[in-house]
Amino acid sequence: MDKLSDASGQGACLRGTIREFEKCKGFGMWNCPEIIAEIQGRVGFLTLNRPKALNALTLPMIRALTAALLRWRDDPNIAAVAIRGMGREGPFGMFCAGGDIRFFHQAALAGDPVLEEFFTEEYALNHLIHTYPKPYLAFMDGIVMGGGMGISQGASLRIVTQHSKLGMPETYIGLFPDVGGGYFLSRLRGAAGEWLALTGQVLGAGPAVALGLADNYFPSQALPAAWAALADLDWSAPQALATWLAAHELAAPADNTLPLDAVDAYFSLESLAAIMVALEADPSAWASQTAISLRLRSPLMLHVALEQIRRARGLSLAEDLRMERDLVRHCFFTRHLARSGTSSETVEGIRAMVIDKDHQARWQPARIEDVTPEMVAPFFVSPWPSNAHPLRGLG
């Protein structure tokens, strides 16, 4: 049927959703005005249209994106797909700030099963994008955080501008870098993946290109013309995309500010405790600021994120997404971790940083040094048998 199907014959991993996709004859069936899907020439164009919420992803948006991509994947008249975000003043200027974390908080407190559906379907969408058989172009102008990275890092071309701000800031709210973050961060040079996962460091265009999180740099003023020109390309020509790129891209701004030697020296150390000891012994401003930033985050989830990145280096994309699906289940539903439902680090982090905004998260444990391996290990035990995993159908 499609790549979300279970080849073992045990059924689709997203059985209900896939049944709905099979009924699709157009895009209006999701009734999701927050995704604009249109065809011009041989290109399927997608626009995230929730600018007042920084284009944060909702479950209807994820379903609409998935429906469009599945339909266009199998349509011989569609040669490529392009995606952008709607800004406050029109197209571009903003890509996607991630998932709707206020919804996460409300759903977790209510025990709403829709939260489970959200992450299963979001991660399946991430896999679909990474494995998409046609060119998928992401116009990553403005904010590209969390879930925004999830729908752009698998792109054939990842285009950034002088306004781009890329990051995986999940540890700030007591989460971990999900949406395939374990996979794409762990494959960066040196210990950059550990650094970005733990600190949530935000990158501009130059550093993003230098680290391999973006491919091409366009000045923002060139985006409307570049977007429109895709519809006029002769996609049967072997050099169509190369010609298009040559007409619009510039060299990415040179960037000498990435502290890569320090990143490798500290974030390649064997444990989070060792990283902290080394950072706090270094009198440099960078080391001091980095240590202070880490001390503000959930000690437990910093340990989990470090373990996640290091495990992911040996995993395929599908294996990583299954691991992340396990992790996110543990983050929001904590009974199996011998923690009460109200002691979820993620729920507490969202409360402190987003809901109440008191910035006084009550992390448990409160200190990095008090986290034990026995606290971290259960996060990496799947709550599902392999034949019942919600992402078992990912190949």
Q: Where in this protein do the model-derived segments appear?
A:
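Conserved CoA-thioester-binding segment of acyl-CoA-metabolizing enzymes
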Residues: 23-84, 390, 395
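A structural preference for short, pocket-lining loop segments at secondary-structure junctions
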Residues: 41, 46, 64-109, 128-139, ...
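Glycine-rich beta-to-alpha active-site loop
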Residues: 87, 129-173, 196, 200-201, ...
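An acidic, glycine-rich surface segment that forms the CoA-thioester-binding/catalytic face
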Residues: 101-140, 181, 378-385, 391-392
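Gly/Pro- and small hydrophobic-enriched strand-loop and loop-to-helix capping segments
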Residues: 155-178, 212-227
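Contiguous mid-protein beta-loop-alpha structural module that forms a pocket-lining wall or clamp
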Residues: 180-183, 187-235
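Amphipathic alpha-helical blocks and their helix-capping loop/short-beta junctions
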Residues: 213, 218-297, 301
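C-terminal amphipathic alpha-helical interaction region
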Residues: 341, 345-395
